[in-house]
Amino acid sequence: ARHCPTEAIRIRAGRAVINAHRCIDCGVCIGVCPHKAKHATFASLDAMDRFSYKIALPAPSLYGQFGGLEDIDYIIDGLYALGFDDVYEVASAAELVSAYTRMYMATPGIKKPVISSACPTVTRLISMRFPYLRNNIMPMLPPMEIAAKLAKRRAIKAHPALAPEQIGVCFISPCPAKVSYVKNGFGAYKSAVDVVVSTAEIYFALLGVMKPHETPRHACESGAIGVAWASSGGESTAIFNEKYLAADGIENVVRVLDQIENGNMQGLDFIELNACPGGCVGGVMTVENPFIAKARIRSLRRYLPISQNAPQKGEDYVPADYFFDEMPSYTPMTRLSENLGESMRLMAHMEEVHRALPGIDCGACGAPSCRAFAEDVVRGQAQLYDCVVSMRKTIRDYASQMHLTPQNEAADTEVNDS
């Protein structure tokens, strides 16, 4: 529970319970829990059976999962062998996003530093804990969404007889945050992705159909710039601006956002933040160690052209449908009531409860900190006597008033006297 950056986890009746209102889907709990109490939820490949025309959207992090592979084409071939009718690489859309980001960064009057919107966990974290930075978020759809839009357009163009509802887009995700993003959307925006499966599931399925000793029939349609998005720093280097910062790992992300909010990040134009360690290669729905996957991605890039995707000639603007309809609203974690007066009263009560607690953050109550426990008490989700330390003190004080000695203290006294 203590590892959760938004204190969304409580231990109730011996089980870990997640507060969905606070959860940002960072996956830290999945990665650190030795008992595997929590796991990511995602669809299986069978969910694509309801579509007549199936499109795979492989995230670039998928390419770093396979050892001894020197050509991405074999992975593309393998996806076709799994039954997909088309493969649209998210790395291809990432190259377009890189180009559009350069255009956006040149827009006069935008608020800087611009914070990438590629990681759903980061954008949700900002909307909950750093509301003053919401206007710094780049209002552009992430590569996954643009890839889904372009893939469906390509399918309709190639097969005019297909109805839109017959076309299914399956994103191969390295993390649970993108699963939640597809389910819930971004603000008022509804995702163009239909199904999300885990990288791990596709990895094991591909092992059975890939043929590395045969000449691949399909070619990779992305370049080094797009594939580099798989690891931290790849997005930043693609915008050709030296005034950037790239950080990964949720704890580092929180520190950077704190610094930006406090005005300590002057002189920077672009901020790339990835909740997963090492970037998307470190997602909890992957298979390979993120550092090994990052090294493989770096090796694969050597065989690729710089880029294979760019805006159409003469297109010096970002298409309107590549922007979010609206930015996420402020959703404070500690809002105790919709009524301002009642909320202030409850906040004062929470501070009063917090002052009465020992302040040692032992976690015995099931909350990650004494402040979190005080909030639970005010919300009616816990009782003050759930704090073991406070309860023992209360019993001790009560016994003292009654001129009694608690049994355990009496035993200690006898031992010391002897």
Task: Please describe what each predicted stretch is.
Residues 40-363, 368-418:
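Iron-sulfur-associated redox domains of electron-transfer enzymes in respiratory
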Residues 1-34, 127-131, 136, 140:
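Helix-enriched interaction subdomains in cytosolic or periplasmic regions
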